[in-house]
Amino acid sequence: AAAWMLNGCLQVMDSRTIPANRNADNVDPALQTATHLCFPTRPVRVQDVRAFILTSFGFGQKGGQVVGVAPKYFFATLDEEVYKDYSVRVTKRSKTADRAYAKALMSNAIVKVQDHSPYEQEDQSRIFMDPLSRITEDAETGSYHFDTKDIRNVADVKARLTRLVRGERLNARPDAASGLAQAARSAQAWIEKQTGGRSSVDTSTVGIDLVDLSAFSAHENETFIERNFTEQEKAFAKQSLDQKMAFASRWAAKEAVFKCLHTQTKGAGAAMKDIEIVKSDNAPQGQAGRKAGLEDIQLSISHGEDCLIAVAIGIAGNGPAKYTL
């Protein structure tokens, strides 16, 4: 609804015409005392529209306001060189858009409806379970699909980690960027060690999870701890000097292993006790059911100043489950 209203406000600013509401024939008398409110029954042409304000009320008592200001006031703040550069780019963009619109009109394809899913049926659960899966467009046909190379193996796990960190950096606080980069470098080094620097490895699944420690407070929730951590995990965390870090790292590891296993989820509130992260001599070790056809799951937890990244790589196979992580 807000997007619909925003489009209308932009049209008002562009056309300098206030639209009519011919159905507003019973305005509450209490509103008639507000002299700054106007409910026109016919379109009103004005000389200029300098700004507008849009208010949207959503479900759950959540709402927002948008203030739109006429472009000329923005352009007036730009240096001449910056304005000229912008003018060149916007002219080029407009010409490209005009050509695309004309082509769509002539081919009767303004709205392109795809009559099939962008993924194969056997890949559906992998797509939905992988937060890093991305759709791509076929330049020749204009159809959309998921790249099977991106979801059926982990040869590009380093690229996937890079995309995740890049996305988190956009949302991170300025003072958290260095810690995120530190954790990413540590995770990258572990991946290089596990893959031996090869461009592809004999893997089938991957799970990556990132936790912002400044926003993590689940360790204070006893119900959360009871539902998601085993007795051994709780004992380990409560013996740690930093219980928050201990619970956060185990939780990130559980999430990464869960994504790696590609098991059918029971919902966002499902307990995670079925996956246990225990401490071994060399690295954290995960214990979980053999439902994903994996012989081994390699797991790493990398720490930054105020965040941590867990990476789980699943090794395909039908042999005895090692799960030496």
UniProtKB/Swiss-Prot annotation:
Keywords: Fatty acid biosynthesis, Fatty acid metabolism, Lipid biosynthesis, Lipid metabolism, Magnesium, Metal-binding, Multifunctional enzyme, NADP, Oxidoreductase, Phosphopantetheine, Phosphoprotein, Transferase
GO molecular function: 3-oxoacyl-[acyl-carrier-protein] reductase (NADPH) activity; 3-oxoacyl-[acyl-carrier-protein] synthase activity; fatty-acyl-CoA synthase activity; holo-[acyl-carrier-protein] synthase activity; magnesium ion binding
Gene3D superfamilies named in the record: 3.40.47.10, 4'-phosphopantetheinyl transferase domain (3.90.470.20)
Residue sites binding acetyl-CoA per the record: 209-211, 255-265, 279-282, 301-303
Pfam families named in the record: ACPS
InterPro entries membership: 4-PPantetheinyl_Trfase_dom (IPR008278), 4-PPantetheinyl_Trfase_dom_sf (IPR037143), Ppantetheine-prot_Trfase_dom (IPR004568), Thiolase-like (IPR016039)
GO biological process: fatty acid biosynthetic process
Pathway: Mycotoxin biosynthesis
UniProt EC number: 2.3.1.86, 1.1.1.100, 2.3.1.41
Record-listed Mg(2+) binding positions: D209, S302
Post-translational modification note: 4'-phosphopantetheine is transferred from CoA to a specific serine of the acyl carrier domain by the C-terminal PPT domain. This modification is essential for activity because fatty acids are bound in thioester linkage to the sulfhydryl of the prosthetic group.
Coiled-coil annotated residue ranges, if any: none
Swiss-Prot/TrEMBL catalytic activity: acetyl-CoA + n malonyl-CoA + 2n NADPH + 4n H(+) = a long-chain-acyl-CoA + n CoA + n CO2 + 2n NADP(+); a fatty acyl-[ACP] + malonyl-[ACP] + H(+) = a 3-oxoacyl-[ACP] + holo-[ACP] + CO2; a (3R)-hydroxyacyl-[ACP] + NADP(+) = a 3-oxoacyl-[ACP] + NADPH + H(+)
Subunit structure: [Alpha(6)beta(6)] hexamers of two multifunctional subunits (alpha and beta).
Described function: Fatty acid synthase alpha subunit; part of the fragmented gene cluster that mediates the biosynthesis of dothistromin (DOTH), a polyketide toxin very similar in structure to the aflatoxin precursor, versicolorin B. The first step of the pathway is the conversion of acetate to norsolorinic acid (NOR) and requires the fatty acid synthase subunits hexA and hexB, as well as the polyketide synthase pksA. PksA combines a hexanoyl starter unit and 7 malonyl-CoA extender units to synthesize the precursor NOR.
Family to which this protein belongs: Belongs to the thiolase-like superfamily. Fungal fatty acid synthetase subunit alpha family.
Protein known as: Fatty acid synthase alpha subunit hexA
Species of provenance: Dothistroma septosporum
Gene from which this protein is expressed: hexA
